[in-house]
Curated annotation (Swiss-Prot):
The entry's keywords: FAD, Flavoprotein, NADP, Oxidoreductase
Keyword Oxidoreductase: yes
Organism: Streptococcus pyogenes serotype M1
InterPro entries in alphabetical order: FAD/NAD-bd_sf, FAD/NAD-binding_dom, Fd--NADP_Rdtase_type_2, Ferredoxin-NADP_redctase_2
Cofactors that this protein relies on: FAD
Domain of life, per lineage: Bacteria
Name recorded for this polypeptide: Ferredoxin--NADP reductase
Amino acid sequence: MKDKAYDITIIGGGPIGLFAAFYAGLRGVTVKIIESLSELGGQPAILYPEKMIYDIPAYPSLTGVELTENLIKQLSRFEDRTTICLKEEVLTFDKVKGGFSIRTNKAEHFSKAIIIACGNGAFAPRTLGLESEENFADHNLFYNVHQLDQFAGQKVVICGGGDSAVDWALALEDIAESVTVVHRRDAFRAHEHSVELLKASTVNLLTPYVPKALKGIGNLAEKLVIQKVKEDEVLELELDSLIVSFGFSTSNKNLKNWNLDYKRSSITVSPLFQTSQEGIFAIGDAAAYNGKVDLIATGFGEAPTAVNQAINYIYPDRDNRVVHSTSLID
């Protein structure tokens, strides 16, 4: 289906995309955010939700979740002119009369200008690869942890052997009823000190085992079947929640279909963040230019310039002088 025209469509709902949407709202234009994941926030929200970030201006420290919550709260001021589309991957976009037609895996969208803020590309969790896994996902099977308290008093099973798996196991030790870590190797890939703490903890370690099947009722998993590597031994683990910590894969596979100049996995832009196609801009990690510093703070600075240039492109005859927010918001 093809929807109404928006002034600016932002591809990517991470920190840079969210701030760009806020600034566009500040400038009085309509905005649509298209995000490939099931939630906003990008890498800080998904990959390190509980870890501290120290390089955001005016915040000595804050977590990925806190950063995301603040940006969403900031954007909510303009919810009447902002539309958010989740679980949509942008496949192609084409120049049409009055703007661009954007085709995703779900729908066709129309926009007068586009700002690409998709970071290093769409990323997705590495799954167990088991039948019925998708049925349990986001019910009691999780690929990342946002709130540790949601696992209070539960039997939690964690699959994985990296830093995140070990960190979550240690963090949940005193919150959950029990924590069991399943890893396909005897050796863990996490920091040595963390592994030492894990081995000295009350967390149950099952190595080397691999997941073989999930059993449950409806949308809730109840048991994980695991098998010892190179042996016939099979165990069934009862669980209330299952955390799969195999990491995430990133991909800009659709970039080649966007007909834009790019280097490696980033889009080449001008000093005003214009891509090789007029009316399309790129910011954040998605943008490549000489001297680029890949920081969230850098992307925050790029967003207003890209938004202002997009507005100039859409409304060239309008008085587009930039006004400070103190003059616009009481």
